[in-house]
Amino acid sequence: MRSHYCGDLRASHDGETVELCGWVSRRRDHGGVIFLDLRDRNGLVQVVFDPDTVDAFALADKVRSEYVVRLSGRVRMRDESVRNNKMATGDIEVLGKELTILNEAETPPFELDAHSAAGEEVRLKYRYMDLRRPDVLKNFQFRSRLTHVVRAFLEGEGFMDVETPILTRATPEGARDYLVPSRTHPGSFFALPQSPQLFKQLLMVAGFDRYYQIAKCFRDEDLRADRQPEFTQIDLEASFVEEEDIMGITERMVRSVFKELLSVDLPDFPRMPFSEAMQRFGSDKPDLRIALELIDIADLLAGVDFKVFSGPANDPKGRVAAMRVPGGCSLSRKDIDGYTKFVSIYGAKGLAYIKVNDLAAGAEGLQSPILKFLTEDAIKGILERTGAETGDLIFFGADKAKIVNEALGALRVKVGHDLNLVEGEWAPLWVVDFPMFEEDEGQYHALHHPFTMPSCSAEELKSNPGEALSRAYDMVLNGTELGGGSIRIHSPAMQRTVFEALGISDEEAEEKFGFLLDGLKYGAPPHGGLAFGLDRMVMLMTGCESIRDVIAFPKTQTAACTMTNAPSPVDNKQLREVGVQVRKEEG
């Protein structure tokens, strides 16, 4: 039906007759001449109809925004005075000769330009219209190019693209599963996979050596901002590898993606132990573009009478930390109150601070409600250890270590952006040496997942599980976890030891993971892998603010689709066929 895409026409096509199809982006009537801006996937071109082409002119007079048309005409150069440098096709226009209206369109529910003020709710309800907007469309063109580069790279590294099941069995991987009732096995359920983890490990047992997949994953998580119940991973696994092998392959892959799509040469990927990341930045995914750091000062405050500080300072599970903000004296009382409210989200009971108005003036040059509770030596020690200078502000966190890390870690990022303290565009790193487990109310939980190989022997793991480190590694970029992976357990005995540390009995392990344990008995090779969040990678690289901007048909923050009204009730006949009865909520 067409010879060219609208957005592909250039001065080199001058004089050619072309056939175009697309949507009418705008119609203008200028003194008896009608101009149509015709849009397709590749861009926009101006088409001119004059009264000499009687039939086509009459139809052009009828068309309105978003009508679908087909036309033919001759490409010609625009007069220099009316050329549009803001359009890729701005040097030329098409003199229309024939026009066919393929479909009419109602008035769109919102403007389809980049400056549309439409809210997200209406945009998601009419998502197919929202996707017509050029600034939205370009995100998906970028995403398509990214997956193409990834596939080409991994194929070149000897990885095979293998699809794993979508209907599988429920296995505890951290979040709740989406369950699918089986009609042919009444009372039994499939689960949608949270990841291809166990299947890709079994592909290594099968001898596939190198596997990858652009995999759809599902997690029925509690509602959180910018999380999606279904998301896409770049998933890979390889046999006969150690950490350096997987990290090397994936680092080269990410470098290749950035080079080909953004013409960016990423800086070095430093390695940082988990413990150092938490100590310095309060986060296991620190944004290294922000120079602010958390500095331990518990030893300086353990003896003060101020229990807010001395309590956590003397608590083995507590932490007292300071964060120096260069130029922070400019923050107003209102600003500080706002930050105090912000850290309360993370459980902090308050936010102490000291303003260093004049370092040379000693105590007279400091401003803070807490100065009266601190000794002269403590104040001097804090100023020296933080490297405070005139004009700086020091924030403090004192509580359980988890609360201090989360509160000051989040505050560090917020203050860094608010005060324009972000330096550089890209700051990647590897976080390594993660704890094997985290403890909650006396129960151990896998920090990553229970199939991660520990760095120690089975005997050492049994004797001191709380101190065990794992052979896990996370790739972090600008404070976002791009991907996480590990060397996996390939020994049935070690796998049972880890299950035991997690409180999973032999019976439960056999019932839930028997197929994996069986597979490990038949010559499982050493293997490891990593999974990247494709959606987040695209979001970061395109500069989008929300992950929903890079998913074609995303769910809302309440895990619903306003376009299709999913999830929705189903009729009783369908429920009976799968043996499900819906319990009505009481009250």
UniProtKB/Swiss-Prot annotation:
L-aspartate binds at E173, R219, H448, R488. GO terms for molecular function: aspartate-tRNA ligase activity; aspartate-tRNA(Asn) ligase activity; ATP binding; nucleic acid binding. GO terms for cellular component: cytoplasm. It is found in: Cytoplasm. It catalyses: tRNA(Asx) + L-aspartate + ATP = L-aspartyl-tRNA(Asx) + AMP + diphosphate. Disulfide bonds: none annotated. InterPro entries: Aa-tRNA-synt_II, aa-tRNA-synth_II, aa-tRNA-synth_II/BPL/LPL, Asp-tRNA-ligase_1, Asp-tRNA-ligase_1_N, Asp/Asn-tRNA-synth_IIb, AspRS_core, GAD-like_sf. Residues 197-200 are annotated as: Aspartate. It is an enzyme of class 6 (ligase). Its main location: cytoplasm. Keywords: Aminoacyl-tRNA synthetase, ATP-binding, Cytoplasm, Ligase, Nucleotide-binding, Protein biosynthesis. One of its GO terms (biological process) is aspartyl-tRNA aminoacylation. Its EC number is 6.1.1.23. The record marks H30 as: Important for tRNA non-discrimination. ATP binds at R219, D220, E221, Q228, E481, G533, L534, D535, R536. PROSITE patterns: AA_TRNA_LIGASE_II (PS50862). Belongs to the class-II aminoacyl-tRNA synthetase family. Type 1 subfamily. Homodimer. Aspartyl-tRNA synthetase with relaxed tRNA specificity since it is able to aspartylate not only its cognate tRNA(Asp) but also tRNA(Asn). Reaction proceeds in two steps: L-aspartate is first activated by ATP to form Asp-AMP and then transferred to the acceptor end of tRNA(Asp/Asn). This is Aspartate--tRNA(Asp/Asn) ligase. It comes from Alcanivorax borkumensis (strain ATCC 700651 / DSM 11573 / NCIMB 13689 / SK2).
